[in-house]
Amino acid sequence: MPTLTSYFGFLLAALTITSALFIGLSKIRLI
C-alpha cells in the first residue's frame, strides 16, 4: 500500500526533524 509507506515516511521525516531541532537547541544551550 503506497499510502501506508508514505505515511511511515512522513512520520520518520517528522521524527528526524524534531530530534535534529532538539539536538540543535541543546547544543545552543550548552554554548
From Swiss-Prot:
GO terms for cellular component: chloroplast thylakoid membrane; cytochrome b6f complex. GO terms for biological process: photosynthesis. It holds the Pfam family PetL. It is found in: Plastid, Chloroplast thylakoid membrane. The keyword Hydrolase does not apply. Its main location: plastid. The chain crosses the membrane at residues 4-26. Keywords: Chloroplast, Electron transport, Membrane, Photosynthesis, Plastid, Thylakoid, Transmembrane, Transmembrane helix, Transport. It is a single-pass membrane protein. Component of the cytochrome b6-f complex, which mediates electron transfer between photosystem II (PSII) and photosystem I (PSI), cyclic electron flow around PSI, and state transitions. PetL is important for photoautotrophic growth as well as for electron transfer efficiency and stability of the cytochrome b6-f complex. The 4 large subunits of the cytochrome b6-f complex are cytochrome b6, subunit IV (17 kDa polypeptide, PetD), cytochrome f and the Rieske protein, while the 4 small subunits are PetG, PetL, PetM and PetN. The complex functions as a dimer. This is Cytochrome b6-f complex subunit 6.
